[in-house]
């Protein structure tokens, strides 16, 4: 939530909502081509073989042909890597990878940053794989320079970023102006900056991103003209702004018609300890108590699925919103996620104030939310903000903390939203449960249902989790959430949080666990 400016089941999951993976293809056998080796003890006058390796990543990138693999031996490479060549569908990708299990480290210590620049930087590239590296220590202390761990930009297809460890990418400058801008960095950034040509068929999987100093930017972001992607099985933690962000309407694409991330899957990720409270881009007096950083955020994206993720100990667990007036986040499905212990709220939707955009035609289904709103601010488990239209909120478990706030919606710009088949529970019992809907407060579960017309089939009961002290929010066999949901196969998905088949009884369970 920028208040200042700014898993393996991929194909099947997307097919459920008719969101295609486009041309994402199964592996193809290619004809033999030349592979290359890089070592800290090598020389760029060598042949690039295992016995006579190159010294620099860049030289290997300059000579690699479609289908080549560049094997990087263990060691520290204080170098940038600029990738402008491409693999091909016929010959295969160009792959950059560590050699066997050796620790190949790309270290930015002392390297300059020019504009927005990745220490690994892909421009208009196609059929490229970057995997198995540790990428670290790329920093700037200068306003309006943006260091990035891996930066993919322009247009391109079939880009895979896998199993990299990215940390200590930082901008430590002092933000400027009334909107506190100019302090920005990313761990991974994919910017579709052309039109109509997009960046498409992007796979970002198995990476770890941590200890990032981001200012008003994000840990892992897709922005602009990006179409067809998967962000799966990543671990993102201990950063000072948003974990995963899908963005539209920021002007990254030269055409407004294409300036929106779309047709993607965010699944199987674990995002935790994400907070803006010590980030001066949200207020220079630290801690600023902004509580504005989402674990997972969709800001103007569309036609995508957020499923089977864990988001906890962040400012906000998951948010689907639009920061731009007159624009909307649309057709996003948030399902089968575990969201717990977040400071402001569990799931938020709608513009964060009445100068923002809207959330339209989205689904929030089969999620488990447990004791979010840990700061006691009253945003509750589900925070329904400005301008929400025609959304579905069903089959979720909402367990409140000490405030007993379940849903908080202070705006009257709320129309066509369907809320039903949810399970609620809180320490004060049904009579003390607090709800705000269309700026009307209701104390008590019965008063809320009769006053709003919501949740005719909802329950107020202890969901009987396995072990909350161990954050195990699976259901005991005696849970009232078992078989108590609404079985709408068009939206509930094929798998639960653990990858087990949905609907094993008479009806779907309420919550993330089947």
Each model region followed by its residue ranges:
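Sec-dependent N-terminal signal peptides of Gram-positive bacterial secreted proteins and lipoproteins
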Residues: 2-24
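Right-handed parallel beta-helix/beta-solenoid
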Residues: 23, 28-58, 76, 100-102, ...
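Acidic Gly/Asp/Thr-rich repetitive segments characteristic of extracellular carbohydrate-active
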Residues: 40-78, 82, 448, 479, ...
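Extracellular beta-strand-rich solenoid/capping regions of secreted or surface-exposed proteins
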Residues: 58, 62-66, 78-95, 104-131, ...
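Short glycine/acidic-rich loop motifs that flank beta-strands on beta-rich extracellular proteins
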Residues: 77-82, 108-119, 139-148, 170-186, ...
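Predominantly extracellular beta-rich ligand-binding scaffolds that present long acidic/polar faces
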Residues: 80, 84-85, 91, 114, ...
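Right-handed parallel beta-helix
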Residues: 93, 99-103, 126-137, 157-170, ...
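C-terminal accessory segments
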Residues: 446-514
